[in-house]
């Protein structure tokens, strides 16, 4: 199995690359989608976030108010670190679970992880390609 890491900022073209490779048979594991799943109401992550940051991060419909979370963590380095401690280990574990699930059947698995280098993933990958303008 070829394991490819894809990273880049907003508007960098990650979605286009992911879609093109998926059209050619690659299995795409999207970290942002996993984060949203893990932060759904009723999950441990959601409960821990509400416990840490308060009910002000819950929207009227009971879902996570991402803008409210951003308002809290943007100016508070400790809050940002706490958010990372709640979310990142679970995302990492879920990505590893999905990789293992695909290891016997997939030829190519693409990890779409916006914070690939910052999250400590490069050691998992056999090849890293960087394109600088």
Where are these regions (language model features)?
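Walker A (P-loop) phosphate-binding motif
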Residues: 1-26, 30-33
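Generic leucine side-chain signal with a strong bias for well-ordered alpha-helical environments
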Residues: 3-6, 64, 111, 115-116
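Residue-level recognition of specific faces of alpha-helices
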Residues: 9, 17, 37, 72, ...
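Short alpha-helix boundary/capping motifs
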Residues: 11-12, 39, 132
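Short, structured coil segments at secondary-structure junctions
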Residues: 24, 53, 123-125
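Short, flexible turn/loop "capping" segments at secondary-structure junctions
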Residues: 26, 61-62, 120
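ATP-dependent small-molecule kinase phosphotransfer cores
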Residues: 33-107
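ATP-dependent NMP and nucleoside kinases share a basic, alpha-helical "lid"
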Residues: 96-104, 108-133
